[in-house]
Amino acid sequence: MKKQSGMTLIEVMVALVVFALAGLAVMQATLQQTRQLGRMEEKTLASWLADNQLVQLRLENRWPALSWSETTLQAAGVSWHIRWQGVETDLPQLRALDVEVRHAKSDKTPVSSLRTYVTSP
């Protein structure tokens, strides 16, 4: 009797399951990386907007108010809500300036927030 060489149907099916699971793992990793890339792009843009607002406020050379001020603008095809306020410090001639960037005014947490310190003009 001759011995037949080759793979049985069960062996082929097990190999297909292994390759299918590996393919699913690769697809899931790629999807997660794509989502993270979008979030990173969003945070980078929000950080730039916060930095631009800080620079604009510094160039105005005004003492920051202790209440929130706000504006809405369009950047990269998206509407952004930016707000800022002065915060008292232990030194009367120094004030903290906080800037927060959100997608909407009603968002609970900002996408980006920055703080700098300004001296009395």
Curated annotation (Swiss-Prot):
One of the GO BP terms on file: protein secretion by the type II secretion system
This protein's UniProt keywords: Cell inner membrane, Cell membrane, Membrane, Methylation, Protein transport, Transmembrane, Transmembrane helix, Transport
Recorded topology in the membrane: Single-pass membrane protein
Post-translational modification: Cleaved by prepilin peptidase.
Main subcellular localisation: membrane
The keyword Cell division belongs to this UniProt entry's keyword annotation: no
Protein name (database record): Type II secretion system protein I
Localization in the cell: Cell inner membrane
Function: Component of the type II secretion system required for the energy-dependent secretion of extracellular factors such as proteases and toxins from the periplasm. Part of the pseudopilus tip complex that is critical for the recognition and binding of secretion substrates.
Modified residues (N-methylmethionine): M7
Residue ranges listed under propeptide: 1-6
Sequence intervals crossing the membrane: 7-27
Family: Belongs to the GSP I family.
UniProt xrefs under SUPFAM superfamilies: Pili subunits
Signal peptide positions on this chain: none
InterPro entries, per database record: N_methyl_site, Pilin-like, T2SS_GspI_C, T2SS_protein-GspI
Record bears the keyword NAD: no
Name of a matching Pfam family: T2SSI
Cellular component terms per the entry's GO annotation: plasma membrane; type II protein secretion system complex
